Amino acid sequence: MKGILGKKVGMSQLFTTEGIAIPVSIIEVPENIVTKIITKEKNSYNAIQLAAFDKKQSRFLKPEIGHFAKANTKPKRFIKEFRDFQGYKLGQTVDVSIFSPGEFVDVTGTSKGKGFAGTIKRYNQAIGPRSHGGGGGSKPIRQTGSLGDISGNKVVKGMTMPGRLGHEKVTKQSLEIIKVDKENNLLVLKGSVPGPKKSFLVIKSAIKKPNPKNPVSLFVPNSDKEVKNE
């Protein structure tokens, strides 16, 4: 299974030669460094550890600095393991060219944190009646109507209650690759990806759609030529 680390740049839109607008997410994918090789003989599974995005060496402990020194690279901020991704050696680089337009990928990131929220925003519950006493008293408009059966004498685990919304691990599956820009280390995906701008993302080959489709032909303004998706 192929995989790489990236950072969300933002969203935009592209047009096909038929004039159809496609909402796209732009992801910065620098060269990833293989910082560890995990073998089945030693660790009971096969994987490689990838690292990306430099960080000041003064912010790392000496054991961490030594770990990156084995791969002959500077300390990195973002580190992840990818199972069953073989064929690479310690210190080797992995870039965006491992993917091609038409392939599908799964993108994992941390969703935007929205702070403390009520049940209506957090769980899409219905708002109470705005008349006949619904504005106050025993059942205010934006309050949960019931917390459970009277015979339970307790609130059962998992009841929808107010609390923190967002800032959790989210995976969007089967996003189509529209364009691969090797020169600028960019990956353009159809649709949205989790998280705010500048947030880190893990990009892997899609589990549910392993077969690629024909690349989309993009329109270029002031030109009669189509964009070559390479």
Swiss-Prot record:
Coiled coil residues, start to end: none
Pfam families reported for this sequence: Ribosomal_L3
Gene3D superfamilies: 3.30.160.810, Translation factors
Cleavable signal peptide: none
InterPro entries linked to this entry: Ribosomal_uL3, Ribosomal_uL3_bac/org-type, Ribosomal_uL3_CS, Transl_B-barrel_sf
Assigned GO CC terms: cytosolic large ribosomal subunit
GO terms for MF: rRNA binding; structural constituent of ribosome
Function of the molecule: One of the primary rRNA binding proteins, it binds directly near the 3'-end of the 23S rRNA, where it nucleates assembly of the 50S subunit.
Record family assignment: Belongs to the universal ribosomal protein uL3 family.
The protein's name: Large ribosomal subunit protein uL3
Native organism: Mesomycoplasma hyopneumoniae (strain 7448)
Name of encoding gene: rplC
